[in-house]
Amino acid sequence: LSRRQRQMCIRDRGGTTGASNAGREPYCEYYASQVAETMGLNAVHYDLENWKGITASKCELFTNIDTAYIPIGRIVRTGGIAACLAWYEKLGTEFSEQLCSMLVFDALIYNEDRHFGNFGVLRDNHSGKIIAPAPVFDNGLSLFCYAGKEDYAHLDEYAKTRSNPYNISYEEVCAEVMGARQKEQLRRMIGFRFKRHESLNLPEEHLQAIEK
């Protein structure tokens, strides 16, 4: 492998298999990445590829020999998302703002899988110091990933059946963390449309339903 290839994506993920609506996670990862980028978040960029006949999402690593990812669940062990917010606030405004932005983003895309291993911080492997919030990553279980054709016309009702890992509604999370930065990030979504992949896409009716 070339040096560039070694630096490039070493994180390929396929989707689930089985039911007619299975296997959609890589697609939703790709589309959710577009939302994060439009909002201007510190987020991992995802693309799609066909790998040995399997549709997979791919991205570049955000860690290296000098930098480690530490999941928040290894640091804040009790108290849920409220305790995580308080811990981030102690690290400073930028840490706190990025966490709040991630939570608003998750609510916007109905991310159902932002558990305490799916966000965290970056640590300098030499000094042991926390140096930055980790970028937003792993957003595949979102955008009504498992919605069926019968749900597309009634997404408002379907949305009520979706939940995050915190036992708090998406609306309650947003009410707690929404600030000026997050409002500006949401304004950037006005008129947003998903960029279709040249060959790998969710059904068009799914995309049109979630674009409304």
What are these regions (language model features)?
Residues A19-H45:
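A conserved alpha-helical element in kinase catalytic cores
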Residues Q5, I54, K129-A132:
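Conserved catalytic motifs of the protein kinase core domain
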Residues L1-I10, D47:
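Single conserved hydrophobic/aromatic residue that forms the stacking wall/gate
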Residues D47-L91:
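Conserved structural core of kinase catalytic domains
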Residues T16-A19, N118:
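A short, flexible beta-alpha/helix-coil linker loop
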Residues R11-T17, E60:
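Active-site ExK catalytic segment of metal-dependent nucleases
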Residues H126-K212:
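C-terminal catalytic region of ATP-dependent kinase domains
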Residues A83-G148:
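Conserved kinase catalytic-core segment
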